[in-house]
Amino acid sequence: MFSPMALRPRCAKWLIVTGLFLMLGACVEKPSTLERVKEDGVLRVVTRNSPATYFQDRNGETGFEYELVKRFADDLGVELKIETADNLDDLFDQLGQPKGPVLAAAGLVSSEQRKQQVRFSHPYLEVTPQVIYRNGRSRPTTAQDLVGKHIMVLKGSTHAEQLAELKLKYPGIEYEESDAVEVVDLLRMVDEGQIDLTLVDSNELAMNQVYFPNVRVAFDLGDARSQSWAVAAGDDNSLLNEINSFLDKVEKNGTLQRLKDRYYGHVDVLGYVGAYTFAQHLQQRLPKYEKHFKASAKQEKLDWRLLAAVGYQESMWQAEVTSKTGVRGLMMLTQNTAQAMGVSNRLDPKQSISGGAKYLAYIKEQLDDKIEEPDRTWFALAAYNVGTGHLDDARKLAEKEGLNPNKWLDVKKMLPRLSQKQWYSKTRYGYARGGEPVHFVANIRRYYDILTWVTQPQLEGDQVAEGNLHVPGVNKTKPPEENPPL
């Protein structure tokens, strides 16, 4: 016979057991953000698609932010997965979404408004906000001069925040925020006169100004600010703490400085006249020799754009030139080098380019195995200019000074010492104009950057047509010089 009284002890037991399971479940902690990243084996990062942050060229993914965050992923022992945001609002929206990016590495500047959305890491790069105008037009020099100008900035940027604050003091300031453009587009619009002014950070201008010969800095809008990575405001501290430890480490061991040098250590070497002249020659001279650069580079397993950059540095792509020291031709080969590389006529552009390619490839092959890319390329270029003997002397000086003889950032500091008696008197190969290879390499790196940029359609959108290289500003009349470059 069923008895309700007999059921009570059973129910009590079940309630106790169920309660214990619930308590045990509550005691199991949710894995931290860092633990989830390591368990998944993937670091999901959101960034911007721009030359200063992340882009893809024929060699794959690249960019300052990409290289830095790739090192962080490698440090964690996980795969890096990059997502690109359509605009800044999209970037912040993606951050922290379920199964979405856990980190934003996009050259972000911290601000009080942004701190309501995200938390920022330790800083890793200092930049200055700059007002940009077109050469030949009236140059603004103060915030009040922004009144009445057609200004456009990135929507959701700290530059928009700055303009909003200025508008409180100068109500006549009007500006447009756009989520359909990137920094490159804003600079192009100033260059072509579509807008009067824009605001960009100094690092992005430095990387892009050479492509836009007409743009100038009007004035700095405020003090320098720091760029940082960002994580979602609601996340725990685990990933942010790991990021900060990583950034502190790469700052101390020199990795961060070498990365800065790779991307920003050569960007200001051309100046206005050099940039404009190179842009002209890119269209007028390069087409005559492009097939030879490509063929010789393929033969020697080099990047044809690097080889072309060397040719421009040597002769400005002129085939029949002779220097006062006797080097001749498009690649400015010495008689001995020409003979060694099988060049019978140094003034024949095809032979000259072939000889230069063989010589550069030969130098790269002879370098110390401890020198890795990209430093290996910069060392080879320096040796192409000053000779392997003097380069070895500079490496030994670097080692004596406690620097790394296998890093271009360190060795380029030693090369100028080869022209100072107190230093070259202690070397095997003696005096050299050691400053020349430093400038030689810096110029070639800049020319190479431009050649890479204009041969990548995705970087310039519809401006670059297949087989028809375009450099902004090239087809325009040379702008007036009454406003000197800053």
Swiss-Prot record:
It comes from the Bacteria. GO terms for cellular component: cell outer membrane. Residues 268-486 are annotated as: LT domain. InterPro entries: Lysozyme-like_dom_sf, MltF, Solute-binding_3/MltF_N, Transglyc_AS, Transglycosylase_SLT_dom_1. The lineage of its organism: Bacteria, Pseudomonadati, Pseudomonadota, Gammaproteobacteria, Pseudomonadales. PANTHER family: MEMBRANE-BOUND LYTIC MUREIN TRANSGLYCOSYLASE F. This is Membrane-bound lytic murein transglycosylase F. It is found in: Cell outer membrane. It catalyses: Exolytic cleavage of the (1->4)-beta-glycosidic linkage between N-acetylmuramic acid (MurNAc) and N-acetylglucosamine (GlcNAc) residues in peptidoglycan, from either the reducing or the non-reducing ends of the peptidoglycan chains, with concomitant formation of a 1,6-anhydrobond in the MurNAc residue. One of its GO terms (molecular function) is peptidoglycan lytic transglycosylase activity. The gene is mltF. The N-terminal domain does not have lytic activity and probably modulates enzymatic activity. The C-terminal domain is the catalytic active domain. GO terms for biological process: cell wall macromolecule catabolic process; cell wall organization; peptidoglycan catabolic process.
